[in-house]
Swiss-Prot record:
This is Transcription factor E. GO terms for molecular function: DNA binding. Keywords: DNA-binding, Transcription, Transcription regulation. The keyword rRNA-binding does not apply. HAMAP family: TFE_arch. Monomer. Interaction with RNA polymerase subunits RpoF and RpoE is necessary for Tfe stimulatory transcription activity. Able to interact with Tbp and RNA polymerase in the absence of DNA promoter. Interacts both with the preinitiation and elongation complexes. InterPro entries: TF_E_archaea, TFIIE/TFIIEa_HTH, TFIIE_asu, TFIIEa/SarR/Rpc3_HTH_dom, WH-like_DNA-bd_sf, WH_DNA-bd_sf. Residues 5-87 form the HTH TFE/IIEalpha-type domain. GO terms for biological process: regulation of DNA-templated transcription; transcription initiation at RNA polymerase II promoter. Disulfide bonds: none annotated. Transcription factor that plays a role in the activation of archaeal genes transcribed by RNA polymerase. Facilitates transcription initiation by enhancing TATA-box recognition by TATA-box-binding protein (Tbp), and transcription factor B (Tfb) and RNA polymerase recruitment. Not absolutely required for transcription in vitro, but particularly important in cases where Tbp or Tfb function is not optimal. It dynamically alters the nucleic acid-binding properties of RNA polymerases by stabilizing the initiation complex and destabilizing elongation complexes. The keyword Manganese does not apply.
Amino acid sequence: MTDSNDPVVRGYLLQLIGEEGIEMIENMPEGEVTDEQIAEASGVMLNIVRRTLFIMNENNLAVCRRERDSSSGWLTYLWQLDLSDIESHLVKEKKRITKNLEIRYNFEVDSVFYTCPEGCVRFEFKEASKCEFMCPACGEDMMFEDNSVMVKKLRDRLDALEASS
């Protein structure tokens, strides 16, 4: 099984299922188990266990098997974690993040910004000129924003992601 203490895996799972979901995974019994057994073993509320299992199933990180009780006709859902494919999920997530950072980086590089000194708004030059460089919220004169620090942070983050390939 994949180590849920690996910071990259843990960060991905945290984003996907939250802290209670991670707690559930860490305390989940081995093999096929019911959601009630998972809730009892992990101490996580049953509705959160079910929500987490459905999210993990949608992302192919958990497998569900239905079993019908022959006497009552009731269905029992048996769950088992399958984190064997998490590496491909991490690669997809990295690509998504890289794409979004590149879009933001290009936007920051290609634009000139004006901001309200009170922090009300941040506009590109075109929008700022439409309101005559006056903040529409508070009426203060908007100031040119040097976004070079933001551009550098975005570039550094993109470089770090590329270096981790």
